[in-house]
């Protein structure tokens, strides 16, 4: 700290201002039920696109919430947690992280490999660089927060052979693994090697498709086609920052 006195003088008021913003976001918060790739009628409380007149009453179903908004909020909540130690920021960040990762397309292709990628939102079929890249760094940060804490585990759902199963693993391992998987998807699907920048998205319109299994409804994979769109700078930036954080955590070049 080059100016410790300046920091000590102003940090409390900025921390208080951030907390006010955090509480105010509840006007964008709502609750709905979602049929995802591995969950039937799961209840989630993300932040919506539009502001409500009362806290917790925002409409958030379908296209009224998008995953990338949640990702950027997770990033700021984790930064605030590391600076303040406020547990509520970490808890909310993990709630939103679970919601975002529920959007990961874990359905399998003909070779038994995950399709991968996160759609723009639960009401969309397209997958975007902006709904994948921003989540890499915060997942690495979460992994570091729980590194060495063996008692902290998480249960998640997967499709190892086309059937839905649950598995319990350490949070540090799970978050780091998902960071690497999302990073690989982002790089493989959006990076233009000849230009060194990223496409915007892949896929387009169309309704979200569902299928039934054991009397329950789940989301189905949607074919995407070729990537395209304008190469917005922040989509390349999240790939770079994600790579830097992954390298710092793993040492893998």
Segments from the language model and where they lie:
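Glycan-recognition and catalytic cores of secretory/periplasmic carbohydrate-active enzymes
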Residues: 1-253
């Amino acid at each position: 700290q080059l100016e410790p006195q300046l920091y000590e003088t102003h940090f409390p008021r900025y921390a208080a201002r951030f907390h006010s913003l955090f509480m105010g976001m509840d006007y964008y918060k709502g609750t709905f039920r979602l049929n995802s790739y591995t969950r039937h009628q799961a209840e989630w409380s993300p932040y919506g696109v539009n502001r409500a007149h009362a806290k917790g009453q925002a409409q958030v179903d379908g296209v009224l919430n998008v995953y990338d908004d949640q990702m950027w909020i997770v990033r700021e909540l984790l930064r605030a947690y590391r600076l303040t130690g406020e547990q509520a920021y970490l808890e909310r960040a993990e709630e939103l992280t679970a919601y975002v990762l529920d959007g990961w397309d874990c359905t399998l292709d003909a070779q038994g490999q995950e399709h991968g990628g996160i759609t723009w939102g639960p009401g969309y079929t397209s997958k975007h660089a902006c709904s994948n890249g921003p989540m890499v760094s915060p997942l690495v940060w979460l992994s570091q927060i729980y590194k060495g804490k063996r008692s902290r585990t998480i249960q998640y759902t997967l499709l190892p052979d086309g059937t839905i199963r649950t598995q319990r693993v350490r949070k540090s391992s799970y978050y780091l693994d998902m960071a690497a998987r999302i990073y690989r998807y982002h790089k493989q699907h959006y990076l233009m090697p000849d230009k060194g920048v990223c496409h915007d998205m892949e896929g387009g319109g169309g309704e979200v498709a569902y299928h039934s299994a054991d009397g329950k409804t789940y989301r189905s994979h949607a074919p995407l086609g070729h990537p395209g769109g304008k190469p917005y700078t922040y989509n390349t930036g999240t790939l770079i920052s994600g790579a830097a954080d992954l390298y710092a955590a793993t040492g893998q070049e």
